């Protein structure tokens, strides 16, 4: 069993299961509680990850041809890229907005009309606040499915999100 401490003790690349030359991508935690934990992914790992994400998205109700708004951060954090490649694997059109720029998020949702959003549950509540600040009813927007993860959230948050957007909210 590999622990987070094992990854930190062997920072940055000491726990890779293959030579670094076979690693196609590196992701890492923010390191807020210590050294970042670094994980290397081979091409095969990335292909499997995309397929797993695509299956999870399909199970949520997202389907081929849907427009997917991705508001997870892109970069060392795994969220944005995992969601991105999973959506492409499923055959969706990706809007890779990344995190932040909440006003722009709402503008793009209103203009592009995505059916699925992928984001942290706490950040979608910020997006909800922006809808309300603009006097918009989020239930009237195009979002049918919310795929949320990367942090814990409560059943009360799920109900608030589902009720506010009239969407199906799932944890990934």
Give the label of every model feature segment:
Residues 1-28, 33-51, 55-59:
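Nucleotide 5′-phosphate-binding alpha/beta core
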Residues 23, 46, 73-75, 122-123:
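Short glycine-enriched loops at secondary-structure junctions
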Residues 50-67, 102-114:
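Conserved ATP-dependent adenylate/AMP-binding module captured primarily in the ANL superfamily
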Residues 58-94:
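Conserved AMP-binding loop of ANL adenylate-forming enzymes
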Residues 29, 68, 117:
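Residue-level signal for inorganic ion chemistry
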Residues 38-42, 51, 60-62, 79-82, ...:
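Short, conserved acidic/polar surface loops in the N-terminal third of protein domains
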Residues 81-172:
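Conserved adenylate-forming
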């Amino acid at each position: 069993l590999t622990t987070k401490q094992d990854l930190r003790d062997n920072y940055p690349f000491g726990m890779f299961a293959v030579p670094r030359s076979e690693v196609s991508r590196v992701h890492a935690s923010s390191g807020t509680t210590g050294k970042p934990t670094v994980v290397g992914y081979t091409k095969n790992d990335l292909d499997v990850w995309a397929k797993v994400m695509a299956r999870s998205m399909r199970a949520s109700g997202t389907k081929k041809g849907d427009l997917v708004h991705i508001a997870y951060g892109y970069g060392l954090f795994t969220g944005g890229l995992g969601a991105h490649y999973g959506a492409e694997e499923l055959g969706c059109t990706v809007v890779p907005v990344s995190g932040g720029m909440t006003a722009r998020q709402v503008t793009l949702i209103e203009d592009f009309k995505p059916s699925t959003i992928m984001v942290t549950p706490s950040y979608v509540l910020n997006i909800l606040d922006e809808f309300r600040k603009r006097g918009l009813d989020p239930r009237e927007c195009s979002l049918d499915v919310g795929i949320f993860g990367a942090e814990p959230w409560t059943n009360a948050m799920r109900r608030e999100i589902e009720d506010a957007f009239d969407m199906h909210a799932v944890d990934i």
